[in-house]
UniProtKB/Swiss-Prot annotation:
Organism from which the protein derives: Shewanella sp. (strain MR-4)
Keywords: DNA damage, DNA repair
Record protein name field: DNA mismatch repair protein MutL
InterPro entries hit by this protein: DNA_mismatch_repair_CS, DNA_mismatch_repair_MutL, DNA_mismatch_S5_2-like, HATPase_C_sf, MutL/Mlh/PMS, MutL/Mlh/Pms-like, MutL_C, MutL_C_regsub
A Pfam family it matches: MutL_C
Domain of life: Bacteria
Length: 644
C-alpha cells in the first residue's frame, strides 16, 4: 500500500481517539469553549449518560455566520495566531481540533448568534468529506451545541463505554472541578430531564464557601484552611484540609491559570508540607496557582491534563512554603479542632483573651497571608522582627512564665526569633476560654509536630529549667563595653564578645539534638568542586546535624535548607568556605557553634537584647564570660594621683 493522504473524516476520527475518550471528554471540550467565549451561564443537558445526547447552551459572544463553517474544520481557532501566542496562552482551547473531532464520531449541530446579528445560524457536517452546511435558525445571543449518538459510526469505541450511570458520574465529577475555579459562572446539569446540579454564581466569599460545600462536602468546607500567598509573579490561593481532620476525601484539585491539571509536583509539595502533621496520608486541597503564562507550557499533553513549568523546583518550593506557612498559623492557634460546623454563610467568632484584651477571630476559614504580610512583634523599642503573629515582649516587671497555647512541651520562658537571635522571657499569655481553652492546653500530636517545624519561628529542644529574671544591666562605656563593679574592682566587658559567647553557648546546646533546617524559597546554586560529592558523603551526619540540605546535580551545589542562624548570610560564599574547611578535619562542636554565632550576630539589635540573653545563662557560664573582662587599675591610678 502506497503513501496517501487520509480522508478528512478518517483523519478526524483518528484525532478523536485522543480528544474524545468518553462523553465527559466531549462535555469538557464544549464547556471550555463556552468559557473562552465569555459565557456567564452554561446549561448542560445529558441523556443516557451522554451516549444519546449531550447539549451545551451558553450566553457567550457567539460565532459569526461567516466563521461557522471554519469552526467545524480541523486546526481552526480564534485563540491564537502565532507561536508567541502559544507561549503565553491563557484560554482553555487553542488547537482548533475539538469540534472537528467530535463531529466526526457523532451527529453534531452548532447553532449560534452574535450580538451584531439579527438572526442565528445553524451548522452541521456530514458525508465522507465532512462538508459543512449552514442554515438560518432561531436562537438568542450565544451558542448551543448538540452532540447526538456519540460513537454511532465507531462501534468499537461505543462498546468500551461503561453504564449510563458511570459515564454520567464522570461528567458530574468534571463539572465539580470546573465549578470550583470558575465561581463566577452559573452552571446547571440535567440528566434524563432531571436537574442534578445547580451551581449559582458565587460573587462573594460566603457564596463561594457555599459552592465549596456543594462540591467538596460540608466538613471539608467548615474545617478548611484558607491559603492566600503572593510572591513576585506567583500567586497561590485556595483551601487546604485541616491537619487535624481524620476524614478521607477525594478533593484533590489543582489549577494553573484556571486550568485543572494533574501534577506530581503539587502532590509532593502537599505531602511534604503535611509530613508528621496530618492524620490522613493524602490531605484534600483546592489550590489555584496564577503564574506568568510564559513560565508554563500547557501544550504537553493531548488532553491538556498536564503542564510543564520552566522552573519546576522554584514552583515546588513556593507551594511548599505557602502551605507550611498556612499550617504554621493554624498550629499557633493551638486548637485541637479549630473549626465548628456551621452554615457556609455564617462565621463564628472565637474570643481570645490576651493581657486583658479581647481579640475577635473569624474561624470558618482562616485567611492565611503570605510571610511578607504577617504582623511584627515587639521585642523592645529599638527592634522589630517577624515572629508569625506571636507577640513576645520584655518589661521591667516580668510576669511568671506560662504554657504557650501552641505547645505542650515544658517551656523555659524564652523564645528565639526567626533568625535565631537573642532569647527573652515571654509575658504571661492566657489562652481561649471554655472548651477551646481546654483543647488549647492539650493539643494533638499533629499540633505539637506542626509547632516544632515552624519556618518563621523555629522551635528547638529546650531544657526544663527554672526561669531566671533579667539582671540589672550595668553602665555602658562608648556603647562598646559594660562597666562591671565587683567590690572595689572595676572591669570592662566587651559587648560584642558577650554576644558571641552567648550565641555560641545557645547553638552548642542545640547542636546536641540537631538544628532544624528551613527551606529556602529560592534554592541557591553554586559551581561545585570535584571533591565536594565525596565531602558531602563523608560528612553526611554532620551536615544533617547542622540543618543543612545540600545536593550536587550537574556539577552544581544546590543549597535547599539552612539553619536559622545562616538565613541572613551570603550562602554562596559562606557554605563553600565551610566545605573547604572540611577537607582538613571535621570541626568540634564548640568550633561549629562559634562559626554559626559569627554568622548570626546581626540578630542582636541592641545591648539590652544581648544582656537579656546573657541573663538567661547559668551562673557558672556567666562567670566564665565575666572572667574575660579587662580590669581597670583605677585604685592604682587614684593612689598615683594622691602622691602627685
Amino acid at each position: 500500500m502506497g503513501i496517501q493522504i487520509l480522508p478528512p473524516q478518517l483523519a478526524n476520527q483518528i484525532a478523536a481517539g485522543e480528544v474524545v475518550e468518553r462523553p465527559a471528554s466531549v462535555v469538557k471540550e464544549l464547556v471550555e469553549n463556552s468559557l473562552d467565549a465569555g459565557a456567564t451561564r452554561i446549561d448542560i443537558e445529558i441523556d443516557k449518560g451522554g451516549s444519546k445526547l449531550i447539549k451545551i447552551r451558553d450566553n457567550g459572544s457567539g460565532i459569526p455566520k461567516d466563521e461557522l463553517a471554519l469552526a467545524l474544520s480541523r486546526h481552526a481557532t480564534s485563540k491564537l495566531h502565532s507561536l508567541d501566542d502559544l507561549e503565553a496562552i491563557l484560554s482553555f482551547g487553542f488547537r482548533g481540533e475539538a469540534l472537528a473531532s467530535i463531529s466526526s464520531v457523532s451527529r453534531l449541530t452548532l447553532t449560534s448568534r452574535t450580538a451584531e446579528q439579527t438572526e442565528a445560524w445553524q451548522a452541521y457536517a456530514e458525508g465522507v468529506d465532512m462538508a459543512v452546511k449552514v442554515m438560518p435558525a432561531a436562537h438568542p445571543v450565544g451558542s448551543t451545541i448538540e452532540v447526538v449518538d456519540l460513537f454511532f459510526n465507531t462501534p468499537a469505541r461505543r462498546r468500551f463505554l461503561k453504564s449510563d450511570k458511570t459515564e454520567f458520574t464522570h461528567i458530574d465529577e468534571w463539572l465539580k472541578r470546573i465549578a470550583l475555579v470558575r465561581g463566577d459562572i452559573h452552571f446547571t446539569l440535567t440528566h434524563n430531564g432531571k436537574t442534578v446540579r445547580n451551581y449559582r454564581p458565587a460573587m462573594n466569599e460566603p457564596q463561594y464557601l457555599q459552592r465549596l460545600t456543594q462540591v467538596a462536602g460540608r466538613q471539608f468546607a467548615d474545617e478548611a484552611l484558607r491559603v492566600e500567598c503572593q510572591h513576585d509573579d506567583l500567586r497561590l490561593s485556595g483551601y487546604l484540609q485541616s491537619p487535624w481532620s481524620t476524614v478521607l476525601t477525594d478533593t484533590h484539585y489543582f489549577y494553573v491559570n484556571g486550568r485543572l491539571v494533574r501534577d506530581r509536583l503539587v502532590n509532593h509539595a502537599v505531602r511534604q508540607a503535611f509530613a508528621q502533621k496530618a492524620e490522613v496520608e493524602q490531605p484534600g486541597y483546592v489550590l489555584m496557582l496564577d503564574i506568568d503564562p510564559h513560565q508554563v507550557d500547557v501544550n504537553v499533553h493531548p488532553a491538556k491534563h498536564e503542564v510543564r513549568f520552566h522552573q519546576s523546583r522554584y514552583v515546588h518550593d513556593y507551594i511548599l512554603q505557602a502551605l507550611q506557612s498556612a499550617l504554621e498559623e493554624a498550629g499557633e492557634l493551638g486548637f485541637e479542632h479549630p473549626f465548628e460546623p456551621s452554615s457556609p454563610q455564617v462565621r463564628d467568632e472565637v474570643s481570645l483573651s490576651e493581657s486583658g484584651t479581647q481579640t475577635q477571630t473569624e474561624h470558618h476559614a482562616f485567611e492565611l497571608q503570605s510571610p511578607e504580610s504577617k504582623t511584627h512583634s515587639t521585642w523592645n523599642e529599638a527592634s522589630r522582627v517577624d515572629t508569625s503573629r506571636v507577640e513576645i515582649s520584655r518589661d521591667s516587671q516580668l510576669t511568671e512564665r506560662t504554657r504557650d497555647i501552641a505547645s505542650a512541651r515544658p517551656y523555659s520562658g524564652v523564645q528565639s526569633n526567626a533568625y535565631g537571635s537573642m532569647a527573652v522571657p515571654r509575658e504571661s499569655r492566657s489562652g481561649p476560654t471554655g472548651e477551646s481553652r481546654a483543647r488549647a492546653e492539650l493539643p494533638s500530636k499533629a499540633a505539637i509536630a506542626s509547632y516544632g517545624e515552624l519556618l518563621q519561628t523555629p522551635s528547638y529542644s529546650v531544657q526544663d529549667k527554672p526561669y531566671q529574671p533579667v539582671l540589672a544591666m550595668p553602665a555602658m562605656l562608648n556603647g562598646q563595653y559594660w562597666v562591671l563593679a565587683q567590690g572595689q574592682n572595676l572591669s570592662l566587658l566587651p559587648i560584642q564578645s558577650v554576644a558571641l559567647a552567648t550565641r555560641s553557648h545557645e547553638i552548642e546546646t542545640k547542636l546536641a539534638t540537631g538544628l532544624i533546617g528551613q527551606p529556602l524559597l529560592m534554592p541557591v546554586s553554586i559551581a561545585a568542586d570535584t571533591d565536594w560529592p565525596a565531602l558531602l558523603e563523608e560528612h553526611e551526619t554532620l551536615i544533617r546535624q547542622l540543618g543543612l540540605e545540600l545536593t550536587i546535580r550537574y556539577q552544581q551545589l544546590i543549597i535547599k535548607k539552612v539553619p536559622p542562624y545562616l538565613r541572613d548570610s551570603q550562602l554562596a560564599k559562606v557554605i563553600p568556605e565551610w566545605l573547604q574547611s572540611l577537607r582538613f578535619e571535621a570541626p568540634a562542636p564548640n568550633a561549629l557553634a562559634v562559626w554559626l554565632a559569627e554568622q548570626s550576630l546581626t540578630g542582636f539589635t541592641s545591648a539590652a537584647d544581648i544582656w537579656a540573653a546573657y541573663s538567661q545563662l547559668t551562673e557558672e557560664k556567666r562567670q566564665q564570660i565575666a572572667d574575660k573582662a579587662v580590669s581597670l587599675p583605677w585604685q592604682s591610678w587614684l593612689e598615683e594621683q594622691a602622691i602627685e
